[in-house]
Amino acid sequence: MALFRHLTKNMLVECQRSGRFDEHLAGFYSLAYGNPYIYKDTYLAYYDQHSRILYLSLFELNGSENKIQCILTATKLFKPQKLIITTPEELPLNLAGFGCAKTEYDRDYQIHIPSFDETLRGGTFKQLRYRVHNAEKRGYTLEINRRMTPGHFHIIAQHEQSRKLDLYDSQLYLGIWEYLRKFKSPLLFNAFLEGSLIGFDLVDFFKDTMTIPLGFYTDAPSLADFVLYKEILYAKENNYIWLDLGWACSSGVEEFKRKWTAMPRFHIWAYEYEKQTSGLGIGSAESTNILQSSGPN
């Protein structure tokens, strides 16, 4: 049995449906990070042959497999120059001839929709109630569709200009349009003021979870609160159990998510490994028994 199988579009969709966390965005990641594969039907991998970066998600789809063995097998097969790994547990800082250049710990925050009081009554929601009402008084409106416009690209460009982005962030941003074009499930939640786009979220849906992988906003007051409140209402109306807001990322973003009653459901360690010029080699790959192509869709 092949250890790594190439994933077709239909297989990606199935991974998204059966996943619990990072697997939800397999289709999106496959457009941003490279050709998608699955290791023993459990761990997802994406290989970008241009940058020679291998992305591994060690969150489990089916059962459990040895994570270190997955990494060793992947490095032998793909021969990457760099590894980017997300995992629910800590990893060694040196692996198969790769040394860790960067590590981060984070938590994924989600709102439990059935227990959320959408009326925003009471002292707990006083600030949120004010911000939502402030946005409504200013005339913000929401439109849900799948259409990217020059306004979307302009807001993304402004976001990129104001930040020093990692390569994988830029790759995700560039993949939004194609994700909407190739897959049926994602939607755009667009906020407007007097007919002009002022911000938007990319939203997707899997089983009982509604997830927001990316959001882009101008500096319009109370904008993020307005959009999130509308998304909570949408999740309520469509009987979703969880609204996934993503990683905490920073103390300010984490505080925002906590105010909206989001709780950490998954612990994440993110590692960036670079190939070492000396030390233990990674060996040679006998790919005939490691990699299997699933053919065209």
Language model: regions and residue ranges:
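A conserved beta-strand-loop-helix scaffold within acyl/acetyltransferase catalytic domains
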Residues: 2-51, 96-103, 120-221
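A short, internal acetyl-CoA/4′-phosphopantetheine-binding micro-motif in the GNAT/acyltransferase core
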Residues: 57-66, 114, 214-222
